[in-house]
Amino acid sequence: MNSETGALRRGWTTGTCASAAARAAFEALLGIEPEDPVPVTLPSGARPTFALARLDRGSGFVRAGIVKDAGDDPDVTHGALVLATLRFGAPATGIVFRAGPGVGIVTKPGLPLPPGEPAINAMPRRMIRTALTEVAEANGVTCDLVVEVGIEDGERIAERTMNRRLGIIGGLSILGTTGVVVPYSCAAWIASIHRGIDVARAEGLTHLAGATGATSEAAIRNLYGLPEQALIDMGDFVGGMLKYIRGHPVARVTIAGGFAKMTKLAQGRLDLHSKREAIDFRWLAELYCSIGGKAESGMSVRTANTALEVLQMAQAEHVPIAPAIARSACRVAAGALARADIALDVAIFDRDGCLIASERC
């Protein structure tokens, strides 16, 4: 964080780091002392520079490394060493990409890259090509190169990502569309939702379940016996998931979550994050009284601190608040999906993963 302005500090994508590493490795492969810090051209035209963290020369190859700085974003790859190993390729073969240790291989259809390809996305490939072309043109050589991109300890780090579920095996993905990591950006999560839906559809799955968290995901999987690829890590972005499914349909969609998150959905919120959308306890009190709750209890609902407090009160007084929330959440979700040909339902679970309400929309 900037100590003067309080603004969150931006960082760099794995694609940007791989581009810098590839540039340095190519210069060293040509017998040139690499620039340090290493310049990289971003899609915007900006040219940041990166400290060279590693340079190894071997028989017929050079390996360079850049430490990823994700800024103030809680990125699992922050601090990881991104490596590029370069070798000369056969004449007229151009740039050939390979997955090094810690970078995964695509094994399932539905992703932007076909099965068998290293998980190096389109923009990072373009950025790497740009970096290598700059070096080649400056030195009067061609870009017939084998570029192996790796991430130190990437296979272990990948266990904390969605890669295995998406069919990316063996490590992390080299990502980025702008080259820059925006702290706490929604874009990366929503992109992973889209990729999860794409993979599930390519697998021929017809029933997908979007869950707000690990408890509801495990519960909905057990309830319906769903395969892992049918589970979409929706998080707070129910609106983003439904909008994408509207244009990329499946036969059935289930939305699963806890009582608090589903209360926000019932109130018309399509972004369920606590910092962006708060529960309207006045609305909840009116609902509580409309389904048989006592007036004095309604006053307690209005002044409640948490949704859990309201749920416990309703359970003690036998007021069917969870089914009422499920019905309202269904109406909101159906409006966002806007596809009568897609079966839609909502399931609400308690903190132990027990189903407390469900509704077909």
UniProtKB/Swiss-Prot annotation:
Catalytic activities: Co-precorrin-5B + S-adenosyl-L-methionine = Co-precorrin-6A + S-adenosyl-L-homocysteine
Similarity comment: family membership: Belongs to the CbiD family.
Protein's name according to its UniProt entry: Cobalt-precorrin-5B C(1)-methyltransferase
EC number: 2.1.1.195
Involved pathway(s): Cofactor biosynthesis; adenosylcobalamin biosynthesis; cob(II)yrinate a,c-diamide from sirohydrochlorin (anaerobic route): step 6/10
Domain of life: Bacteria
Keyword annotations: Cobalamin biosynthesis, Methyltransferase, Plasmid, S-adenosyl-L-methionine, Transferase
Keyword GTP-binding: no
GO molecular function, one term: cobalt-precorrin-5B C1-methyltransferase activity
GO biological process: anaerobic cobalamin biosynthetic process; methylation
Pfam families tied to this protein: CbiD (PF01888)
